[in-house]
């Protein structure tokens, strides 16, 4: 627990010791790798000796095999040691990563706390109310500016609509009256037809005049 707390309190010795431990373990792993390479070569050499003396010098061949077996056992031990060191390196790196992650998370939490220190739900609501109020005022001002004005005369939209409807009705009435009206003049007729009709009309006038004269005489 104290190791974890050292990260939060800002102590550098724990993080530096973790890095030093990882560096030391990796150096040891490098040495073991070189040792493994050396032993592998020795095993190959002893195997060659055993094969070369398998039929001619069995005692030497057996000695080579025993030496080969000893190198193999040593190689197995080194492999086990390497596995242990690699596991330890991974564990330290994982713990170091977790600790660094926790440090970053703590800094983030502190930053959020600092940001929210002056913020409250009530304050946010009040600010939003002010914003909405100003937006409403802006809209009212925009509407007032966009409405047409003329020498202080306030235009009633309803009155204008009624006047427009009256004009439309007047035009409609004029059209209907024009459809019912008889034309004031007739189309011109040919000269011959006009002359004949005039003669008939004159005869009718003479007859009416004679009739009126006769009625006057009878009345006397």
Swiss-Prot record:
One Pfam family per UniProt: Snf7
Keywords: Coiled coil, Cytoplasm, Endosome, Membrane
Coiled coil: 15-86, 153-220
Subcellular location: Cytoplasm; Endosome membrane
Domain of life, source organism: Eukaryota
Xref: InterPro entries: Snf7_fam
GO molecular function: identical protein binding
Span list, region Disordered: 175-210
Keyword Membrane: yes
GO cellular component, as recorded: cytoplasmic side of plasma membrane; cytosol; ESCRT III complex; multivesicular body
Keyword set includes Aminoacyl-tRNA synthetase: no
Its membrane topology: Peripheral membrane protein
Entry's transmembrane regions: none
Cross-referenced PANTHER family: CHARGED MULTIVESICULAR BODY PROTEIN, GH13992P
Family to which the UniProt record says this protein belongs: Belongs to the SNF7 family.
Record function comment: Required for the sorting and concentration of proteins resulting in the entry of these proteins into the invaginating vesicles of the multivesicular body (MVB). Also required for the proteolytic cleavage of the transcription factor RIM101 in response to alkaline ambient pH.
Listed name of the protein: Vacuolar-sorting protein SNF7
High-level lineage: Eukaryota, Fungi, Dikarya, Basidiomycota, Agaricomycotina
């Amino acid at each position: 627990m104290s190791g974890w707390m050292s990260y939060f309190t800002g102590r550098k010795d724990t993080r530096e010791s973790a890095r030093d431990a990882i560096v030391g373990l990796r150096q040891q792993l490098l040495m073991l790798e070189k040792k493994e390479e050396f032993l592998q070569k020795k095993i190959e050499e002893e195997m060659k000796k055993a094969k070369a003396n398998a039929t001619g010098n069995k005692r030497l061949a057996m000695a080579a095999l025993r030496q080969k077996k000893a190198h193999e056992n040593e190689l197995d031990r080194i492999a086990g040691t390497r596995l242990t060191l690699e596991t330890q390196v991974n564990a330290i790196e994982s713990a170091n990563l977790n600790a660094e992650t926790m440090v970053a998370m703590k800094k983030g939490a502190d930053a959020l706390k600092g940001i929210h220190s002056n913020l409250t739900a009530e304050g946010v609501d009040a600010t939003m109310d002010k914003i909405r109020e100003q937006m409403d005022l802006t809209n009212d001002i925009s509407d007032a500016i966009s409405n047409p004005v003329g020498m202080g005369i306030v235009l009633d939209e309803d009155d204008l609509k009624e006047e427009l409807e009256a004009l439309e009705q007047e035009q409609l009435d004029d059209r209907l009256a024009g459809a019912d009206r008889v034309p004031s003049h007739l189309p011109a007729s040919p000269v011959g037809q006009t002359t004949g009709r005039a003669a008939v009309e004159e005869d009718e006038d003479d007859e009416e005049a004679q009739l009126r004269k006769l009625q006057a005489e009878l009345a006397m």
